[in-house]
Amino acid sequence: MNILMTSVSRKVALVNAFKQALAEEVGGQVIAIDASPRSAALYFADKAYIVPSGLDQDFLEAVKGICQKDDVQLLIPTRDEELPFFAAIHESFKRIGVTIMVPEPGVVKTCQDKRKFIYFCIKHGFRVPITYEKPEDVVQFPVFIKERMGKGSKWTFRVENASELDDLLARLKDPIIQEYIQAPEYTIDLFADFSGQVLSVVPRERLYIFGGESFIGRTSKKWEIIQEAMQLAQALRLVGHNTIQCFWHEEQVKFIEVNPRYGGAANLSFASGAFTPRMLVRLVLGKKVEPCIGQFKDRYYMLRYTEDLFISEQEMKQIERFHQDRAL
């Protein structure tokens, strides 16, 4: 079985996790693609290609061509911008024998549009931070402001007063204003099969965050979070591996966002016992995967650090460039 991972960038841990999953379960190759030969994770995959940048026809033909050339059975998008692109075409890939780990287009849209996600949560009875429809509705500072379609920590701000708020509202395209919550923040790695049955849930507390990613984290068997995350996943119709963020505030779960893809620190959940890459491989092979809710090491820590990779320019040039004409 061969797996294609897109936009691998520096996601070395994720590439290695799927190599391990294949080795344990069935054998095969992890094939990595990116638009830049300077992407570290390319050099850890079994095979790598440079593909056209942008989500256009050239990119699509290159991806489809690689899938056909290398007999790919599973495709894993890893970048937010790719999710609506692959959600829209996943049925056509099924016809060539490729399963894409992505939910339906409407689910992706609800997750990526932060205002839609807030309304969805309210409609279905899930708590979210207090959201102000208009700046004059703000009753207390500080508040938190973010872009409606923002990604990660980009364009997110803590705002201390009305003057700062007015300044940011003038600069941002489509801002959302919420209460500022000072409370433990959790990322939940939730995995569901392709029918939406939740198989694994691991909350991990974000103890130190840099650039929107958790660099020090700790797993937590907080059952209130586990149960609410399962209910949210079923309401949204999530499939595959998902990254859910929430606060534990005033003895309540308050959801922030859902990213229907692998997150940067998912390897903490893998190490604690919820090895979802192997679960995903088994599902694609048509094997039964039993739910393992709560079966992970509690209070297990991740301390992330930077590791350097040194390669020559010649090695960089050896990565094959896969262009549209090769895919036809």
Where are these predicted regions, by residue range?
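Short, charged, surface-exposed secondary-structure boundary motifs
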Residues: L42, F59-E61, V108-D113, W155-T156, ...
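A short, glycine/Asx- and small/polar-enriched loop/turn
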Residues: F44, V138-F141, H249-K254
